[in-house]
Amino acid sequence: MSAISIETKKVTELTAFTTPTDSCLIPIHDGTGLKKITFANFRAKAVEGTEAKIAPLLFNNAGAHNAIYRGKSLGSTVTTAQYAAIKAGTFDDLYIGDYWTIGGVNYRIAAFDYYLNSGDTSCTTHHVVIVPDTCLYNAQMHNTSSGGYEGGAANTTAGGYVGSDMYKSNLEQAKTTIKSAFSGHVLKHRIYLTNAVANGRASGGAWCDSEVDLMCEQMVYGSGIFSPVSDGSNVPANYRVEKSQLPLFQHEPSRICNRATWWLRDVITASDFARVGGYGDAGYDYASHSIGVRPAFCIS
């Protein structure tokens, strides 16, 4: 007896085939009768328009790469190819949340070209903003002889962030660690920082060189939380180039809280600077408290 023709078999009786080639034929009914189409043509028609829709997510530029959170380990060093991609502004195979583990610290990508075209001297260098997952150490905004909290005059925001001991000396350890981890690639750029305070509000500032600095509320939360605002008569000097939330914290808010309390640079009162709480809360703290140093910096 001859074999049963495929035309007389039920679909469930056919041999399974999982590796079709472009020349394979697929039966298809167009409403007038049964026709055939090659697998290559079927596939092309099925994805028609899809590539155009997803292309913006795959473009090699800062805008596209700022829009994708991946969170991949990139190893223990930035490769020559990765630095080349950063320099070119293509950021090939680098995405928000990706990180390098160097010296036991996860240095995580927080933004691409965040400072591009900003500053009194325009930043024209393509770059990646990096934020460590953990605090590098604890330090005070205003130093005391005891090295810890002291009441009274020890808690002052006079001189703003630029006038603080954090800015003047307590960030040096972080700068040394970071410059060792990313030797020759830490970008110096210009940002506007508070250097005067009146009645517990920022009253003056200046353009400053920045390599490694504390973040501000806008970078972490996307807006000011406790930073003083205009009361209709008095306008605090809250000038800054960091006007938007870092994509890292926008895409993955859990990265804000690392279960430690750490400093931000905003002046909140005559005695308090902003901070992120260990429970994930926004807050502020006396300047003499010794809490976490979790700075941001750029590599290029």
Please identify what each model-predicted range represents.
Residues 2-49:
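Extracellular repetitive beta-rich solenoid segments
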Residues 52-300:
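Collagenous Gly-X-Y triple-helix signature in extracellular proteins
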